[in-house]
């Protein structure tokens, strides 16, 4: 895993999870090789992923559709790059 996204949101975790699954099925699956989604609580999650194309990920996250979804659902993402030690 090389990316960690910590998200807070006003919608429920189930709504966020459905959105992530929809995104993976409709295009993001082309650049996400593997992932884990963890529910911290009803309004916070941690998404760990192995991303193979950071440019494509950035384009998706900054698309008008994604920005609208984030705004409508009060979603704020903090994205971290990870590097395996040892």
Residue ranges of model-derived segments:
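Short S/T/G/P-rich N-terminal loop/turn motif that feeds into the first structured element of a domain
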Residues: 1-69, 75-86
């Amino acid at each position: 895993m090389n990316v960690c996204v910590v998200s807070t949101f006003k919608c429920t975790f189930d709504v966020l999870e459905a959105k992530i699954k929809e995104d993976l099925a409709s295009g993001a699956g082309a650049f996400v090789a593997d992932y884990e989604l963890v529910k911290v609580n009803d309004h916070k999650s941690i998404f760990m992923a192995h991303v193979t194309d950071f440019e494509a990920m950035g384009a998706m996250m900054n698309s008008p559709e994604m920005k609208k979804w984030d705004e409508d659902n009060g979603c704020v993402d903090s994205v971290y790059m990870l590097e395996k030690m040892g």
